Amino acid sequence: LKLKSILGKLGVILSHLNK
């Protein structure tokens, strides 16, 4: 697993939660 990929997915999830 790539850290960047994981962080990217987490970032997207957080973005949706913030909305």
From Swiss-Prot:
The keyword Secreted applies. Its main location: secreted. It is found in: Secreted. GO terms for cellular component: extracellular region. GO terms for biological process: defense response to bacterium; defense response to fungus; innate immune response; killing of cells of another organism. GO terms for molecular function: toxin activity. The keyword Secreted applies. It comes from the Eukaryota. Expressed by the venom gland. Keywords: Antibiotic, Antimicrobial, Fungicide, G-protein coupled receptor impairing toxin, Immunity, Innate immunity, Mast cell degranulation, Secreted, Toxin. Belongs to the MCD family. Bombolitin subfamily. Mast cell degranulating peptide. May also display antibacterial and antifungal activities. Its mast cell degranulation activity may be related to the activation of G-protein coupled receptors in mast cells as well as interaction with other proteins located in cell endosomal membranes in the mast cells. This is Bombolitin-8.
